[in-house]
Amino acid sequence: MASITGSSVSFKCAPLQSSFNSKNYALKSSVTFWRRTPVMPRGLSVSCAAKPEMVTKVSDIVKSQLALAEDAKVTGETKFSEIGADSLDTVEIVMKLEEEFGVTVEEENAQTITTIQEAADMIEALQQNK
């Protein structure tokens, strides 16, 4: 059984469905007009990404834990391994995030975190479930 939790969900592109109209004219042929229409309304946008403020806080904590320069470029997409974190560093980062945000991260969840964004999403979800 699958479940999704979060404040919102984002769909970037809507699948399209095709429809057609055929017209018979006096000539012995048929002309078909194809039209593609979106299945979802264009204005619908849902997102499950953590707020930018949360990503910034998590980035700052990660930079501090790894003793990175203050001006080091760390974004939500940055993987811990790309900035020199090994498995022990990742455990220490998760422990610091738990302490800083007052949440408890299950071990199996902690092992799945590979990016700043994933950590921020997890912390935000845990705070909402408090």
UniProtKB/Swiss-Prot annotation:
Transmembrane segments: none annotated. Residues 52-127 form the Carrier domain. Pathway: Lipid metabolism; fatty acid biosynthesis. The modification O-(pantetheine 4'-phosphoryl)serine is found at S87. GO terms for molecular function: acyl carrier activity. The keyword Protein transport does not apply. It comes from the Eukaryota. Residues 1-48 form a transit peptide. 4'-phosphopantetheine is transferred from CoA to a specific serine of apo-ACP by acpS. This modification is essential for activity because fatty acids are bound in thioester linkage to the sulfhydryl of the prosthetic group. GO terms for cellular component: chloroplast. It is found in: Plastid, Chloroplast. Gene3D superfamilies: ACP-like. The keyword Oxidoreductase does not apply. InterPro entries: ACP (IPR003231), ACP-like_sf (IPR036736), ACP_chloroplastic (IPR044813), PP-bd_ACP (IPR009081), Ppantetheine_attach_site (IPR006162). Keywords: Chloroplast, Fatty acid biosynthesis, Fatty acid metabolism, Lipid biosynthesis, Lipid metabolism, Phosphopantetheine, Phosphoprotein, Plastid, Transit peptide. Roots, leaves and seeds. SUPFAM superfamilies: ACP-like. Coiled coil: none annotated. HAMAP family: Acyl_carrier. Carrier of the growing fatty acid chain in fatty acid biosynthesis. Belongs to the acyl carrier protein (ACP) family. This is Acyl carrier protein 2, chloroplastic.
